[in-house]
Regions:
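Active-site SXXK
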Residues: 11, 34-62, 138-143, 257-260, ...
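Structured C-terminal helix/loop/strand segments within mature extracytoplasmic catalytic/sensor domains
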Residues: 327-374
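Active-site helix/loop module of the DD-peptidase/beta-lactamase fold
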Residues: 32, 37-41, 53-97, 115-116, ...
Length: 374
């Protein structure tokens, strides 16, 4: 439908493309300043904000979350560390009572639920992707320590100083340049896999054994609550766009994200402004947890502190490539940095494709790019 693609190499923009349409009826063309919901790419942005607080000594990743957020420390959550929230091993990957979808702008309703609920598994026992809860968990930590929301913090500390076109929580004035997202349900692919639960392990490869185990635990449908998909247009509503959902509703341009990851891949500094120190970037892009991920179909995802280091079937972590860190989004958007190439890469789109084709375009673009610059 529509997309933008940008690459920053050694602090220079070498690719900046956009085209297609912003809506299903093809009445609005995708323009240079069109922004789009990048979904879970937002997690990387949220992690960057927390990284700034970590390197300033305001947060210690090895301390318990309850040290900063006392109300959180109950029902088995007493020992969960900040690090475990960041690397998806905290056991808080879903809402036990289901996710409220009637008022996305009510931050406190999500916080109260997370404070009161019990863990799904012992902290550190499994890697289980915190698909939506990640944003409220990390966002509340930031708010407790700094006083600002994630959207406010990123705007003040990163976006405005570096002229990066990316926001978590839009204003109504942004709606005119915002592309609609055409979503498909994730449930058909999940339903196609369910028969694996009844296939004897003898007939399964290791990767399908992991998928079978993940399906049996049913963490997948817990984390990706089916009620969200009852109205697949919810991501285009004013309520969703105005809310701050730091795991899933960041909006921006490919140019902005390529610039951001380009800076982080080149030491974290542009001119006199330092986003993160090199040692912080290095720590955040180290592998801190390794799959099989019990939410992401048992696949061997590798996570740093909020960053994906290896994401199967996407450009991030493909074989014979550099040291990558970034994130993907459920509608097909991808942004990452490569420290070996001092490069930032971003492909953003507004039409979700099915299953194995979800990241097909970004993989092909990344492969073509590396064939040129290698």
């Amino acid at each position: 439908m529509g997309a933008s693609f940008s690459v920053e190499l050694e602090n220079q923009t070498i690719i900046d493309l956009w085209g297609g349409f912003c809506d299903a009826d093809k009445t609005r063309k995708w323009e240079r300043d069109t922004i789009v919901n990048v979904f879970s790419v937002s997690k990387a942005i949220t992690a960057i904000c927390l990284g700034r607080l970590i390197e300033r000594g305001l947060i210690n990743i090895n301390l318990a979350v309850r040290d900063y957020w006392p109300e959180f420390g109950c029902n088995g959550k007493e020992t969960i560390t900040v690090k475990q929230l960041l690397d998806h091993t905290a056991g808080m990957f879903a809402f036990r009572e289901g996710i409220p979808i009637d008022n996305w702008q009510d931050w406190n309703q999500y916080i109260r639920l997370l404070e009161s609920q019990a863990i799904y598994h012992e902290p550190g026992q499994h890697q289980a992707y915190h698909a939506l809860t990640f944003g409220w968990l990390i966002g509340e930590l930031i708010k407790r320590v700094d006083g600002r929301t994630v959207g406010e913090y990123f705007r003040d500390e990163v976006a405005q100083p570096l002229d990066i076109d990316f926001k978590i929580g839009l204003q109504s004035k942004d709606f005119g340049r915002c592309a609609d997202t055409i979503m498909l349900s994730t449930l058909p692919s999940l339903n196609q896999l369910r028969p694996l639960k009844f296939v004897p392990d003898l007939f399964l490869s290791p990767i399908f054994k992991n998928i079978k185990k993940a399906l049996k635990q049913d963490y997948i449908s817990e984390a990706f609550d089916p009620s969200i998909l009852e109205d697949q247009n919810f991501v285009n509503t004013d309520d969703w766009r105005l809310a701050e959902i730091p795991a899933a509703n960041g909006h921006g341009t490919a140019r902005g994200l390529a610039k951001l990851f380009g800076i982080l891949s080149s030491g974290g500094r542009e001119a006199e402004y330092q986003i993160l120190e090199q040692h912080t970037i290095d720590t955040m892009r180290e592998i801190h947890s390794f799959g099989p991920d019990m939410v992401l179909f048992g696949l061997p995802y590798k996570f740093g502190l909020g960053f994906m280091i290896n994401a199967p079937m996407t450009p991030i972590g493909r074989k014979k490539r550099g040291n990558m860190f970034g994130h993907t989004g459920i509608a097909g958007s991808v942004a990452f940095g490569d420290v070996d190439k001092k490069m930032g890469f971003s492909f953003l789109c507004n039409k979700q494709h099915k299953d194995l084709k979800l990241y097909k375009t970004s993989v092909e673009l990344a492969d073509a790019l590396y064939n040129i610059i290698d």
